[in-house]
Amino acid sequence: MTSHQVSGVYPVRLLLLLILLLTGLATGCQTGMGQSVQSDPSSDNAVEAIPSPILPNELDQVASFRELIDQAESIKAFERQPLVDRYVAMLPDAPIMSEDVAVFIWRGGASSVQLVGDMNSWDMENAPQFDKLEGTDLWYLETVYEEDARLDYMFVIDEDDWRLDPLNPRTILGGFGPNSELLMPGYKIPGELLPTSGSIAAGKLETHTLESSHLGQNRTIFVYEPAGQLVGAKTPSIYINDGGDFLNLIGATTILDRLIAEREIPPVVAVFVPPINRGLEYALNEDYASFMADELVPFVQQTYNTDPDPARTAIMGYSLGGLEALFTAITRHEVFGLIAGQSGAYSVGEDAVIKRVQRASRAYQTGGSSRQELRMYFVVGTYETAVAGDSIDGSILGANRRLADVLETTKYDYLYEERPEGHSLGLWKGTFGTALRYLYNPEYE
């Protein structure tokens, strides 16, 4: 009897233990899987609730960046940094761009971040401020430019610390060192600046020193003699103001090598003339024009067998060098029949050189004794609106447009271009080949 009672009690106890065990497991599963754990930012063991990160979208990087900001602002500030870290780690390039929008980003400790560059004429007073994403090290600025714009820029940290964009590998030399370079999606790098798979025959560069009676000083010049020049043939020539910059910063000889090798232009002798006193020599200076026409050109013609025909003799320059190039060609048209001006400062002397062009065009149209045939190429950046030294309206763009208005009334052959760029070596390097093609290839328009 007793034994039957004991054997009946154990199954009941086992059943109760099994029920309790199953109940505990169910409760534990509910707590572990169904309930959310709240993070305590003050606790060392807190677990951050990080949503799925937004990653850069190659098809629309700007849209994905905006999604990142929206997502980050929807969560607590202390949870945002991992989202930023993951996004930037996957970012293929910077600035972030799509069509006509560019987003600049900066990461680091700062009290302010600003953008300066061609887009605001490097003016700190008009430099836009970046926004900071609270709780992170991310600063960002969304801007709008033309789809084919090319602009130099830098970041200014805490109002006086000028920096290159550390996330942008593209830089370009400026007047005070390297700048970061923005290439909008529609900008096309000129073919002559792209890498080439084959070998290119290189011309040779020679140095000469001339004694100038017009300038009362010795002048050093550099002469590029092209490869593939026909023996005994008279070669066209081009004389380039700011010759040192064209050699060292623009890489003019490499561009000449490429265009000649690919037969986009004929072999050309290029004469690079560095200034000694740039502000004096390039300010409508008749002595400098006489040095070029009466001393330098005859020396080059005799030494390198260049063609004396004005229709095959060019002069060019940028900014003030472009002003002096146009002035020299207009006043000495019997020597120079080809002109190229890049961002020319034509307002100097109250538009004096523009007025000379107007007078020369009247003589050309009437067929008088001073009749001259000229072929001209001019280019200016649409962001060249506040460049120091342009005396009439503070705008190199404005001066070039006034020149273009005059040219439109003439019978001269000319090509005038405006590009969404600034007063930059990048513009002049990118259009050096275009100028050469227009001047020396009559079929190029």
Where in the sequence are the language-model features?
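Bacterial signal peptide processing site
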Residues: 30-32
